[in-house]
């Protein structure tokens, strides 16, 4: 992103972003301290590479981003597949091709990366179930 010199440029850039289409799919890689220490940057790069090999990187079809901390640090690195909300735990760079292939191409969750088959989404986990995300609802 270019450096913005003033408020006018910021407003212009904001208008530009507002006019861009939302990606149909998004992979959020937790960028919190615990996940970063566990290899989230390498995972992020591996997901970008795998998406690029499928012709999806930086397209309207898919966006791969680092998010803020999700709070479940001992299970990191974490990945959330949107809009489905599939929540993967203890993800490694070696899992990137499977995530891109299964979750994005085939439309199926990678069940070995979720805590239990009945807990595919973050909201299904006991840690997140009582929480209501307000300010950080669009984490990232």
Regions flagged by a language model, labelled:
Residues 1-140:
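Feature of Fe-S/electron-transfer and energy-metabolism proteins
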């Amino acid at each position: 992103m270019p450096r913005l010199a003033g408020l006018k440029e910021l407003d212009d850039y904001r208008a530009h972003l507002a006019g861009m289409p939302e990606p149909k799919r998004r992979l959020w890689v937790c960028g919190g301290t615990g996940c970063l220490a566990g290899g989230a940057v390498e995972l992020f790069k591996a997901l970008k590479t795998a998406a690029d090999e499928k012709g999806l990187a930086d397209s309207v079809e898919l966006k791969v981003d680092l998010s803020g901390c999700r709070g479940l640090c001992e299970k990191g690195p974490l990945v959330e597949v949107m809009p489905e909300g599939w929540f993967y735990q203890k993800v490694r760079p070696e899992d990137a091709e499977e995530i891109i292939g299964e979750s994005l191409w085939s439309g199926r969750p990678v069940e070995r990366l979720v805590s239990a088959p009945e807990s595919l989404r973050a909201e299904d986990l006991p840690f997140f179930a009582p929480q209501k995300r307000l300010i950080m609802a669009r984490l990232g």
